[in-house]
């Protein structure tokens, strides 16, 4: 889906373009560079990606229709320490790698136009992690019902 570029970058660039034109220096350089990637996407590529996205959504909805909800980690990794990814050229690669992993699971649900919630499920005193309960668009009630039941079970522990 992202081979020709990112829908998020194109859409964020469309929104931020007037502000960037006047105040680009006020943006975090890492964030600004990701937004500015959207300037390179053509209208043809954007429309192609939107059609591909709609086809992907339809396939996903058909596959998950019989499930109450789907479960996955909210993030793929425990977020790194700030000192490991703090601004600085030497840490940029680590930042972008961690950022991609932290956003990966929720971005998939967003790209699929799904709905989700995240339940904290970490052991007291350990770094926080979340369990994402998700489903296709319009299945909010199912997600909330499953999430409430899981929350009740987690509280018994």
Where are these regions (language model features)?
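Structural helix-boundary/capping segments
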Residues: 40-41, 47, 58, 110-157
């Amino acid at each position: 889906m992202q081979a020709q570029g990112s829908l998020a970058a194109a859409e964020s660039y469309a929104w931020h373009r007037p502000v960037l034109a006047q105040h680009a220096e006020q943006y975090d350089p890492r964030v600004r560079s990701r937004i500015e990637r959207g300037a390179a996407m053509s209208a043809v590529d954007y429309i192609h990606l939107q059609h591909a996205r709609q086809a992907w959504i339809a396939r996903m909805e058909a596959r998950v229709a019989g499930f109450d909800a789907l479960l996955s980690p909210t993030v793929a990794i425990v977020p790194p320490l700030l000192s490991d990814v703090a601004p600085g050229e030497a840490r940029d690669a680590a930042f972008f790698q961690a950022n991609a992993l932290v956003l990966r699971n929720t971005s998939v649900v967003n790209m699929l136009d799904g709905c989700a919630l995240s339940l904290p499920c970490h052991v007291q005193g350990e770094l926080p992690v979340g369990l994402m309960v998700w489903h296709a668009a319009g299945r909010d009630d199912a997600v909330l019902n499953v999430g409430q039941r899981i929350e009740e079970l987690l509280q018994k522990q």
